Amino acid sequence: MNSNEYEALVNKSKEISLKWRSLPAPQRGELIRLFGEELRLQKEPLAQTITKEARKIKTESLGEVQEAIDMCDFAVGLSRQLYGLTMPSERPNHRLQELWHPLGVVGCITAFNFPMAVFAWNFCLAAVCGNSIIWKPSPHANECAEGIKKAWDKVSGDFADLILIL
């Protein structure tokens, strides 16, 4: 990928992040929930891909996919807990309020030996907080990345580009 292609990818991610962040967090959480459900449906084939590419035994591969599913479940709960504090101010007739603001584009680099779990740790939390993600998977785990991306694309509707693979 040359620098122009990279810049185009980053700009595309910025564009989708602005659209994504405007959704209320519980709605973002619902898409993450659907993603987790799709991972549940694809658990066996995704685990087979991990076994093939990362050379893990089947039980380890199944555990890694389960970790991704568990992160989806965790993020769904978080989507209803992104509240801030309201505090008294030293200034008369004023109050202080703590708010969550998305960062925008978040990067994630994953190694071949944990091709799905590490991505899920980063993506699920970043996404539910209103961010898009650019993912650089290991070149030794491309099929794992493609499997995750296909699962997301299946449930994400207009937000398929929330995950962009470098």
Regions found by a protein language model. Give the residues of each.
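N-terminal Rossmann-like NAD(P)+-binding subdomain of aldehyde/semialdehyde dehydrogenases
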Residues: 1-94, 138
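Rossmann-like NAD(P) dinucleotide-binding subdomain of oxidoreductase/dehydrogenase enzymes
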Residues: 84-166
